[in-house]
Structure formats: C-alpha cells, structure tokens
Amino acid sequence: MPKKCRHLLQTSDLSLDEIKLLLKKASVYANDFNAVSLETKEKMQNKIIVALFFENSTRTVSSFEIASLRLGAKIVKLNMQTSSASKGETLTDTFKNIYAMQPDAIITRHAFSSAPFKLAEFSQCPLINAGSGVSAHPTQALLDLLTLYQHFGSLENLKGKKIAFIGDVKNSRVANSNIKLLQRLGLEIMLCAPSSMLPSVSLKTTHNIEEAIEFADILMSLRTQTERHNAPIFASLKDYGNAYCITQKRLEAHAKNKEIIILHPGPVHRDIDIESAVLEDKRSKVLEQVKNGVAMRMAVLEFLLLD
C-alpha cells in the first residue's frame, strides 16, 4: 500500500497550525527567494512536478514554475491545446496517463469545480488545485493572506479587520477561497456587487462601492468574469467601471481618514476594476501579491513534497 500523500484542493485541507507554518516559511522566501536550504535543494533536485492547466493562466502557472525551479525541482508544463485532450481524450484519462509516468506532484487547473476532487481519487502523489471553476483557488487565498500578514504584522492583528470584495464575487474562485479562509481568522467581510454578481450567502452585502470603501480596511477588487456569464450584465465594461471602479476620487471621499490597502488577484482591467492612478498608489499591494505568489507556492511545494 503506497504512503498516503497530502493534497491541497481547498484551504480547509490545512489546519491553522499548518497555515501558520506556511506563512512563516513563505515570509522567509518573500524576503529572499534564494533562502532555500541546501538540504531542501538536495531533496528537491530529483523531484518532477507536472503542471496540467486546462484554463489559461499567467501569474499562477508562471509562479508555480519559478517556485519549483527556485526549490531545485524540475517542472513539466503541458500545453493542453496541443495535447490529446484536444483529440477527445477525457480529463480522467489524461490525468491517469500523466500519473502513470510517476511525477512527484501534479498542479492542475480546470473549468469544472469538481475536477480536482475527482482527480485526487486517482492520485497517490500530491495534487495541488491551481483553480477549479468558481469554487476554489487555495494558493491564491494563501498568498493573499501572506500579503495581509506582512502588512498588518501578525494573524492576531488581522482579527477584526474588515475586508470588502468588490466585483464579480459570484463567479470568483479567488473570492470563495479567500472568504472561507479569512472567516476562520476572524475578519469581517462585506461583498459589493450588482445583484447578479452576488452569491447567496449570509454575509454583509451592498450594491454601493462607496459604502464598501467606508466599511473596509482592505479592498479586494475582482475582475468581471464575462466568460462565465450567460448574458451581458452591463452594456459595456465602461458602464460597469463607472459603478464599481476603485478610483482616487472615491478613496479621497470615503477613505480619507483611514489607512486602507487594495488587492487584486489579476488580471486587472485598468480603469474598470481599479483606476490606473490607484494601481500606482502605495496603497496598492497588487505587485506584492504577485511576488508573494512565488514565495507561498515555494512554501506549499516544500510542505507537500518534503514534510
């Protein structure tokens, strides 16, 4: 019987102590990507990781590649547009064939929310969910938490802080994973979106971005996921931006007397999700999130493959 391995399919797969461990390790790597011990590099140098992405990605796939290489592992990224999946091979058969080659870990992204949970049934190597439908994106939530942890100084300081998610919350796996994780850590949450972009949850909601800004210590803007909409919700993205863009004017009017930070998981629609001037503002932590993506994914890979 092979040794049972750990998967990371959703943030609830991790205990609070394990989350603290990941934050500690990722903080070291965020300060210095080269702070990988010789012991870790020696153990990782023969590890082979496969990235199996059935949806497009820039930040996630690149940061997993860089994280793997910085740890000393080898990574194979499959181009699913030129794979046998384009010839009609099923997801399960594609996965089983890759798994038969005995990689040490598989990172997967798929449009179906259930995909990683189904694939985990066939895997005795660590499986990492890099985004599944609208349900989960655990490493994004962890890197966002790392960004908040760095800014506020500790998990204890995060308790009671208020975060507003602004945008297409209903179709955002990032929001879904973040909400579940941040609720565990004692943050207050508000969702801000038009009715058609709000999920059915027992959380504070508003259709008014000004109310969200006044409520929050942290704003997380989300892009409109038009690829998941059955019909247009606004006449144009510009019309959406007029109602929900985080602008200097709105921040000046509704967050003038408090410290507030702004996050976005990317890709950002400039001047639709967040005004360009705000993205360049010191309150924007968007590029810190990107950097922290490498650090946190280094910590996750080390945790799953070596611990």
Swiss-Prot record:
Q: What does this protein do?
A: Catalyzes the condensation of carbamoyl phosphate and aspartate to form carbamoyl aspartate and inorganic phosphate, the committed step in the de novo pyrimidine nucleotide biosynthesis pathway.
NCBIfam families from the UniProt entry = asp_carb_tr, PRK00856.1
So what EC number does this one have? 2.1.3.2
Q: Which GO MF terms does the UniProt record name? A: amino acid binding; aspartate carbamoyltransferase activity
A biological process from GO: amino acid metabolic process
Q: What is this protein called?
A: Aspartate carbamoyltransferase catalytic subunit
Task: Give the matching InterPro entries.
Answer: Asp/Orn_carbamoyltranf_P-bd (IPR006132), Asp/Orn_carbamoylTrfase (IPR006130), Asp/Orn_carbamoylTrfase_sf (IPR036901), Asp_carbamoyltransf (IPR002082), Asp_carbamoyltransf_Asp/Orn-bd (IPR006131)
Q: Which PROSITE patterns match?
A: CARBAMOYLTRANSFERASE
